[in-house]
Design a protein with these regions (language model features):
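N-terminal-biased segments
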Residues: 20-34, 121-144
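Conserved beta-strand termini and adjacent loop/short-helix elements that scaffold enzyme active sites
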Residues: 81-83, 160, 191-194
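Conserved SGNH/GDSL esterase-like catalytic core that processes O-acyl groups on lipids
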Residues: 46-48, 54-134, 139, 168
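Catalytic His-Asp segment of secreted/periplasmic serine-dependent ester chemistry enzymes
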Residues: 94, 164-237
């Protein structure tokens, strides 16, 4: 029974990976690029990006995102495991927003050269509406960090914070994310301070977000605006 059980578990995991993976770009062996691209540290590597709608891209195609465009520029294998509405700490399966990331990371592929986690927006919203503090988020974020380090000991791992959303619990959530990641020596791109994404301004959102009332999801122009910041950050890892 043991071999059968192992095979059954492997099959379930494979099906779960297929169900959760939003897009898989493979390396193009005939890719043409200038030498400065081909010689870059990102070129031809495998990128796994994991998170919420900042990764799945809400109602727009994944191909419009900064991370997909980055992968295409450097001919990377690209594996997208975004899930709209997903949280680091809170299970939202009943709402069709998926299990919490501190558990869901286990379905990620075994190999990656770069692992990017974009998360925290929905946790902050939940804490804002329920009035609870950050202790539970902190505890489960630690589980996620430890799990990813163990799963990907040779990968370049980093987190990206949400934007500087002007609502309660977003600053508190971001402070915890920065603190916890620092305690594990995980690099973080602090998008609340360094992104150039002015989420508090309606005119800015009308140009660069998927709708003027949206405070999370960039449109294609917004992703193009943010891409150079993340490109510089990732090339420096």
């Amino acid at each position: 029974m043991k071999p059968f059980a192992a095979l059954f578990c492997a099959l379930l995991l494979s099906l779960s990976v297929q169900a959760q993976e939003r897009l898989h770009r493979t390396v193009d062996p005939d890719f043409q690029a200038p030498e400065y691209i081909r010689g870059a540290s990102l070129y031809g590597k495998t990128l796994v990006i994991f998170g919420d709608s900042y990764v799945q891209n809400h109602v727009r195609p994944v191909e419009e995102t900064w991370h997909y465009k980055l992968a295409a520029k450097y001919n990377m294998e690209y594996r997208n495991f975004g899930w709209n509405g997903n949280c680091v700490a809170y299970d939202r399966t009943a709402e069709n927003f998926g299990p919490a990331m501190f558990e869901r990371y286990q379905v990620l592929p075994e190999h990656a050269d770069y692992v990017i986690v974009c998360a925290g927006h929905n946790d902050a919203s939940r804490m804002m509406y329920t009035g609870e503090g950050t202790d539970f988020f902190r505890e489960k974020l630690k589980v996620l960090c430890e799990g990813l380090i163990h799963k990907y000991p040779g990968a370049k791992l980093c987190f990206v914070t949400p934007w500087a959303v002007p609502r309660p619990m977003f600053p508190e959530m971001t402070a915890v994310l920065l603190e916890v990641c620092a305690s594990y020596s995980i690099p973080v791109f602090d998008a609340t301070r360094n992104s150039g994404i002015y989420v508090m301004d309606e005119n800015f959102r009308s140009i660069y977000f998927q709708s003027p009332g949206d405070t999370a999801h960039l449109n294609a122009a917004g992703h193009d605006l943010f891409l150079p910041k993340m490109e510089h950050f990732l090339l420096g890892l």
